[in-house]
Amino acid sequence: MELIVRAVDVGFGNTKFVTGIGGGRASDIRCASFPSRAYPSPRDPSKALGSEGRKTFAIPIGGLYYEVGPDVMLAADAFRATEIHGDYIGTPQYMALVRGALRMMKVDTIDLLVVGLPVAVFAAKKAALEKLMTGRHDVGAGKSVVVHKALAMAQPNGALIDYATQHDKVEAMEHEQSLVIDPGSRTFDWLVARGMKLSYKQSYSVDRGVSNILQLIADDISQEIGQPYTNLDSIDWAMRNGKTLTVYQRQYNPARMRPMVEIIAKDAVAAMMRRIGGAFDVQHVILVGGGAFLFKKAVKQAFSTHQILEMKEPMFANVRGYQIAGTNYAQTPLSSANRQRGATVAEGEGA
């Protein structure tokens, strides 16, 4: 019987996951996403007046219901419910996002679930996250999903695997050095690898992500209007689409902050360059992640003699790579043995 392998990548901005694998090729992997927001409520919000037709799910955790899903912004209040800190994976919000993704995968059992971590915390939190993901997950509405085994990967490693697989370069890159740059919502991650083997000493992440840029612009708007401006999602949309914002019926152009945005991007790239040392032996510079468009100029300046490789739908590069790695792992004898040993299913909160 074919094993069911799925992947989920909970970022600070968006939760990405695999919904299907089509014909089995990397290009056939189907992905989806929703904002990484989880709004708590003492009662099931799916039963509340006005929630009909809303594409969200109520995930029960610890006596509360956390509303997550594509239309979660319709459940938002004035407070932007995010949990952006180093212990993010230990929060009920994180678990609610994972379980929301599991719910949308529409499977009852997953033999191998592949998840990701920022590079800086990968070694410290890998075992804990794999344990947290394994077991029976209550995904709401009387449904549950059983995960038999979990595998955690460093987030940019997924993008490296995705790039090498899609371009049929896995063997060709075996002795070549690659640098994967992954600007996310909270962290700016990078990964150095020879072939598919990571160089942990050169790989890392710093807290210089898209959220820093959005907050910088929000602070400027706040000074202009004389009161706090907190709608970071509107700023993000305007930046991605090259649009102006309407604030109190007046137009505000985020492009005016471009020089300050570039300083943040250069700070992140400079931190990376100090860590990796010289770039003369780097054959592949791969830029991925939802924040790539904000950091592209700084990356090109740092690697002026290199071609910067970009990918289609860069936001999903990591989760596609997780799926490829998980599918390959599930075909190994080691995976079969582990599955037989771990056949019992744990129960509880994030078992």
Task: Go through the PLM ranges and name each one.
Residues 215-223:
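Long, charge-rich alpha-helical interaction segments
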Residues 183-189:
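Ser/Thr-glycine-rich phosphate-binding loops at phosphate-binding pockets of nucleotides
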Residues 190-195:
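PRPP/pyrophosphate-binding module of the type I phosphoribosyltransferase fold
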